[in-house]
Amino acid sequence: MIVVSNTTPLIGLASIGRFDLLHAIFGEITIAQAVYDEAVVAGRKEGGAKREVSGATWVNTVSVRDRLAVEVLLDELDLGEAETIILARELHADW
């Protein structure tokens, strides 16, 4: 099963101490590079998902190939959301 996540579930579950639920339910998840950047690079040290995402071997970070499709979505969405949608399409994600 291919699962692609955006930043909100990562930070939300990390903030309540239940980041592990993603692994328990899905095994592995895939995130776009922009999601990684939001959660880890720009993430807050406390209350975010920096520690959880960077330490999870079951979270895979993948770069989106179709940059033009991402650019089109940026009129309505932020970069993390746009990359997540395009990555899910590129990988034929189940979730």
Regions from the language model: what does each represent?
Residues 1-4, 8-95:
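Active-site-proximal, substrate-binding regions of enzyme catalytic domains
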